[in-house]
Amino acid sequence: MEYKLLVGLEVHVQLGLKTKAFCGCKNDFGGIPNSRTCPTCLGLPGALPSINKELISSAILAGHATNSKIKNIIKFDRKHYAYPDLPKGYQISQNDAPICENGFIFIETCSGLKKINIIRIHMEEDSGKSLHLLESENRSYIDFNRSGAPLLEIVSNPDINNGEEAVAYLSALREIFRYLDLSDCNMENGSFRCDVNVNLLINENGVEYKTPISEIKNLNSFKSVKLAIDYEKSRQKEEWILHRRTFESVGKHTMGFDDKKGITVLQRSKETVADYRYIKDPDLPLIKLDDSYIESIKSNRMVELPFDTRVRLKEQYGLSDFDVVTLTADKNLVKYFEEAAIASSDPKRVANWILSEVLSVLNDREMNILDFNLPPSYISELVEFIVNDRVSGKIAKEIFLEMLERNVSSAIIINEKNLAQISDISFIESVVFEVLNENPKSIELYKKGKSHAIKFMMGQIMRKTSGRVNPVLANEILMNKLRDV
């Protein structure tokens, strides 16, 4: 039996707009429960929705970024289902006419680039949030602050074949939406949510079968996504061997994922499109978009996306794959690097310094680059001192720590403390001569082939110059003198 894992993802991105999708309530996370509501997002009789123009422009921008075909006619539908946190009894969404279709993005995998096709992107509103505070309480609470929040749902083709690819796809989408400033994509706060559809394509003696699709919900981290996919792959394989159930006979069902046990759990059979009783929303008109408007969104708001940035950074600065992946994880870090690199004769070393010393500080202090107190020019200046042998790498790290503490440039500290590296040959020769005169035993050990004697004498040279001497020059001069002894 041969089989292939098929994974499709439905990603919900909550947009960071100022107001909700169909009313004027503030669109923010948290706050006093039910403090950001109005008759419209509470579903009160007679309240009418009005379309947030920024919802449409954001969807268009997302379409451009994912190489999608963008529709000229926008239609909104009502998706009916009964749940306590859905006060109207329906969700405003898009059914048969999504704003974007037939897109794709590339992901980077261990075997190279892979194209993931996107079936559709559609606009919709979020539901409220049910809160189950205490198991002992025989009740639940509902916070409608989230009700009506603007969402985009991105539905991929089942082109993903393992958990690692799923995480790579989610990471790529998250980067795109963050680069475009459409969302903070914070999974903990629910602004980036994912449902995973998993089944197997089985080949037995040339005959293909598909197992029932499991839609796995409540995945709150990339780690959970990977674990759920890996578990479901094994579960479906075993179920096929035991029961040989196919998608045609069973269809689709909804699963939950137990993080503690690392297993999927059957919740219910999946609703069909007919179960949702979609109808066109009679309160929202059809909207026609001119081609010129669609293109204007691209020309005015599109930025260089992370995949393209990685390619450019490698070509322009000679950076490694690791360097560019780490830098582009945060577009503000890329900006910081490029502002430092433009003033440096060695951009590669600037990148190394940022990815080691600067990121270490950011991680220790749990801050991002926007909160970092040193401007990019300070980093490029310090790197130039290293490149030009004005300071050693060891001294540079000490200078960097003082720069952080005092918020001053490296030049000021070097001048104040006379830390510039000594490269004057005549001065170094005098120090070497002094060390040789003081250590005749070390000279004898060197002549007997004892390499540790050289290390000892170099240590003496560094001590006499307070670590400021150019070590390469000092070692070269020392070796020349020893050969002459």
UniProtKB/Swiss-Prot annotation:
Alphabetized InterPro entries for the sequence: Asn/Gln-tRNA_amidoTrfase_suB/E, Asn/Gln-tRNA_Trfase_suB/E_cat, Asn/Gln_amidotransferase, Asn/Gln_tRNA_amidoTrase-B-like, GatB, GatB_Yqey_C_2, Gln-tRNA_amidoTrfase_suB_CS, Gln_synth/guanido_kin_cat_dom
Single GO MF descriptor: glutaminyl-tRNA synthase (glutamine-hydrolyzing) activity
Stored Pfam families: GatB_N, GatB_Yqey
Quaternary organization: Heterotrimer of A, B and C subunits.
EC number: 6.3.5.-
SMART domains, sorted: GatB_Yqey
TM annotation in the entry: none
Function summary: Allows the formation of correctly charged Asn-tRNA(Asn) or Gln-tRNA(Gln) through the transamidation of misacylated Asp-tRNA(Asn) or Glu-tRNA(Gln) in organisms which lack either or both of asparaginyl-tRNA or glutaminyl-tRNA synthetases. The reaction takes place in the presence of glutamine and ATP through an activated phospho-Asp-tRNA(Asn) or phospho-Glu-tRNA(Gln).
Record's keyword terms, sorted: ATP-binding, Ligase, Nucleotide-binding, Protein biosynthesis
Organism: Borrelia turicatae (strain 91E135)
Residues in the signal sequence: none
Catalysed transformations (reactions): L-glutamyl-tRNA(Gln) + L-glutamine + ATP + H2O = L-glutaminyl-tRNA(Gln) + L-glutamate + ADP + phosphate + H(+); L-aspartyl-tRNA(Asn) + L-glutamine + ATP + H2O = L-asparaginyl-tRNA(Asn) + L-glutamate + ADP + phosphate + 2 H(+)
Family from the record: Belongs to the GatB/GatE family. GatB subfamily.
UniProt-recorded name of the protein: Aspartyl/glutamyl-tRNA(Asn/Gln) amidotransferase subunit B
Broad class of enzyme this protein falls into: ligase
Biological processes per GO annotation: glutaminyl-tRNAGln biosynthesis via transamidation; translation
